From Swiss-Prot:
Chain's role: Phosphatase that hydrolyzes non-canonical purine nucleotides such as XTP and ITP to their respective diphosphate derivatives. Probably excludes non-canonical purines from DNA/RNA precursor pool, thus preventing their incorporation into DNA/RNA and avoiding chromosomal lesions.
A GO MF label: ribonucleoside triphosphate phosphatase activity
Designated name of the protein: Inosine/xanthosine triphosphatase
Keywords (A to Z) from UniProt: Hydrolase, Magnesium, Manganese, Metal-binding, Nucleotide metabolism, Nucleotide-binding
Class of enzymatic activity (EC top level): hydrolase
InterPro entries given in the database record: ITPase-like_fam (IPR029001), Non_canon_purine_NTPase (IPR002786), NTPase/PRRC1 (IPR026533), YjjX_NTPase (IPR050299)
Catalysed reactions, as listed in the record: XTP + H2O = XDP + phosphate + H(+); ITP + H2O = IDP + phosphate + H(+)
Cofactor binding mode and count: Binds 1 divalent metal cation per subunit; can use either Mg(2+) or Mn(2+).
UniProt: substrate binding residues: 8-13, 68-69
Protein family per UniProt: Belongs to the YjjX NTPase family.
């Protein structure tokens, strides 16, 4: 059984990690442990680079907290221009896999709040009256009327980030390129 450390305490992100690992390695093949670690970036990362750095930093911090684990996973949501998205970083002792989620265009009034220094989750809580929105379906769930959620979008991106760990065609071609 794989010991997977989720570098987050957010239930929506933990569920996405659990689903992606189950889909990849099988039901009951992974034990997910949540740890609270710093991202090393701002509370609301702006731009692709800062957001990806946050996901990678979460993995580095989780590795220090639980060095005995088989996998470490960082998920960091960010804003670039008028879009929200997230980076997924998955590592084991030998390999890193990464993927960026789908993006969602945000309304101008929310972007104004973000430009004023507020987090997307806070802005969504204000307009919905739900203080837990970022720990549930997120902006994605609200704006797609529940057709998608943070969990479902992150689940897809995590499946892509896990490709280097299980797909023999990918592994053979990746190893050949490194030689």
């Amino acid at each position: 059984m794989y010991h997977v450390v989720a570098a987050t305490t957010n239930p929506a992100k933990i569920k996405a990690i659990q689903l992606a690992f189950e889909d990849t390695f099988g039901q009951d093949q992974c034990r997910i442990e949540s740890v609270d670690v710093a991202s090393g970036v701002s509370l609301q990362p702006i731009g692709n680079h800062e957001t990806r750095t946050g996901a990678r930093q979460r993995v580095m911090e989780a590795r220090q907290v639980r060095p005995e684990a088989d996998f470490w996973v960082g998920v960091e949501a960010g804003i670039e221009e008028n879009m929200t998205f997230a980076w997924m970083t998955v590592e084991n002792p030998q390999t890193r896999g990464e993927s960026r989620s789908a993006s969602l265009m945000l309304p101008e009034t929310i972007l104004q709040g973000i430009r004023a220094g507020r987090e997307l989750g806070s802005e969504m809580a204000t307009i919905t009256g739900n203080a837990e929105v970022k720990r549930q379906g997120g902006a994605i769930g609200i704006f797609t009327d529940g057709r998608l959620s943070r969990t479902s979008v992150y689940h897809q991106a995590l499946l892509l980030a896990l490709v280097p760990f299980h797909n023999p065609i990918y592994q053979n071609h990746n190893n050949a390129a490194q030689k």
